[in-house]
Swiss-Prot record:
Belongs to the class-I aminoacyl-tRNA synthetase family. TyrS type 1 subfamily. Catalyzes the attachment of tyrosine to tRNA(Tyr) in a two-step reaction: tyrosine is first activated by ATP to form Tyr-AMP and then transferred to the acceptor end of tRNA(Tyr). Its main location: cytoplasm. GO terms for molecular function: ATP binding; RNA binding; tyrosine-tRNA ligase activity. A motif ('KMSKS' region) lies at residues 225-229. Its EC number is 6.1.1.1. Gene3D superfamilies: HUPs, RNA-binding S4 domain, Tyrosyl-Transfer RNA Synthetase. The gene is tyrS. This is Tyrosine--tRNA ligase. A motif ('HIGH' region) lies at residues 38-47. It is found in: Cytoplasm. Coiled coil: none annotated. L-tyrosine binds at residues 33, 162, 166. GO terms for biological process: tyrosyl-tRNA aminoacylation.
Length: 413
């Protein structure tokens, strides 16, 4: 498989420094790397493009390396950021780095991992200036779009040095791990070319085999940034975003975005995606593309077992059969429903309003009279009934159901 052709039909080629070197690296079975800075204790769906692309290179015969930025994470990448990042403590970076590496090991276990703190952490300022800084011209750095966009608003020396540190990462992996290719999002082009240029300077332009590759940033058809919801980021950690919510995020994607996402984020073939698109055009109400997208990505990130839970829970929410779920699925359901805490002396009508199942007491009464509200599958008939009078589940919890498909969760203090 020609890796460039594979990525081209998927629409994943943004920029390549040198196609010939990239294909030579593939034929030689050289290493490729992608960096992940530990800015949080979990990656989110915005990182999936790079995780999946790294896995594509692995499947194409490269030795894939995931580089955890335990060193560069102490500084923060300024590329196209409006403001300087808040510096993290050493303890925060170590904690985040460990969490992210463990997460990636679960998702892409065949990939090798490294941490740049292993070589940057022991480098003195004198060593950095002598071995790295002397090979970078200030005017060269100022011409980088990723740096130029920050000059007018202010850029510290700390962040200014980031691209040189990343260049040294590539050089270190090139020399010690036969890593000939760095991949990243299109916002990383400046940092990646700093690396290929630095390697060329160190080993000689006639000898270098380094190449850089970027993929486009994923945006939705309406122009909005991909990966955000009203409640915030969609995380790859099931403790931060439940598997059900993760699955639903993909189920709810717009028709106009699905083909692109299937190409970008799954390993389905062109023929399989074309067939899905044709089926969708015949019967769009079945949402075949969305269901396949959700299944493929949830399986990739969380595995078959968790995917099956998400599908069963989706069916249970649709049929209104929540309380008959087994304990594991009921726990997942509870994690996936918006929750508020209320005192046991709260009345039913106040609880309905507080949980946002109704906008007012008048509307709540209308729902009660229409038998449209239930607490743990028992229709509410008395608006003055106290929460203390209701049989709870799972440590003082009450599942509030409005109509057939709207759920809320009350936890009695």
């Amino acid at each position: 498989m020609n890796i460039i052709k594979e990525l081209e039909w998927r629409g994943l080629v943004k920029q390549i420094t040198n196609e010939e070197r990239l294909l030579k690296a593939q034929n030689d079975g050289a290493a490729v790397y992608c960096g992940f800075d530990p800015t949080a204790d979990s990656l989110h769906v915005g990182h999936l493009m790079m995780i999946v692309t790294l896995k594509r290179f692995d499947k194409a015969g490269f030795q894939a390396i995931g580089l955890i930025g335990g060193g560069t994470g102490m500084i923060g990448d300024p590329s196209f950021k409006a403001d300087e990042r808040k510096l993290q403590t050493d303890e925060q970076v170590k904690f985040h780095a460990t969490a992210i590496q463990n997460q990636l090991l679960r998702i892409i276990p065949d990939v090798t991992f490294a941490n740049n703190v292993d070589w940057l952490g022991n480098m003195s300022l004198i060593d950095f200036l002598r071995d790295v800084g002397k090979d970078f011209n200030i005017s060269y750095l100022l011409n980088k779009d990723s740096i130029a966009t920050r000059i007018s608003t202010g850029l510290s020396v700390t962040e200014f040095s980031y691209t040189m540190l990343q260049a040294y990462d590539f050089y270190n992996l090139y020399i010690n791990h036969n890593c000939k290719v760095q991949i990243g999002g299109s916002d990383q082009w400046g940092n990646i070319t700093s690396g290929t240029d630095y390697i060329s300077t160190r080993v000689g332009s006639a000898n270098t085999e380094a190449a850089g590759f970027t993929i486009p940033l994923l945006t939705k058809s309406d122009g909005q940034k991909f990966g955000k919801t009203e409640s915030g980021a969609v995380w790859l950690d099931s403790n931060k975003t439940s598997v059900y919510d993760f699955y639903q995020f993909w189920i709810n994607q717009d028709d106009n975005d699905c083909v692109k996402m299937l190409k970008y984020l799954t390993f389905l073939t062109k023929e399989e995606i074309d067939e899905l698109e044709a089926k969708h055009k015949e019967a769009p109400h079945l949402r075949t593309m969305q269901k396949t997208l959700a299944s493929e990505i949830t399986k990739f990130v969380h595995g078959d077992k968790e995917l099956n839970k998400a599908i069963k829970l989706t069916d249970a929410f649709f049929t209104g059969n929540i309380l008959n779920l087994d304990d594991d699925l009921l726990e997942l359901a509870i994690k996936s429903i918006p929750t508020i805490q209320l005192e046991k002396t709260t009345s039913a009508i106040d609880a309905i309003v507080n949980v946002n199942a109704a906008s007012s007491k008048r509307e709540a009464r209308e729902f009660i009279n229409a038998k449209a509200i239930s607490f743990n599958d028992v229709a509410v008939q008395d608006e003055n009934m106290l929460l203390s009078e209701i049989k709870t589940i799972k440590n003082n919890k009450i599942i509030v159901k409005k109509g057939k498909k709207k759920y809320y969760l009350l936890e009695i203090k």
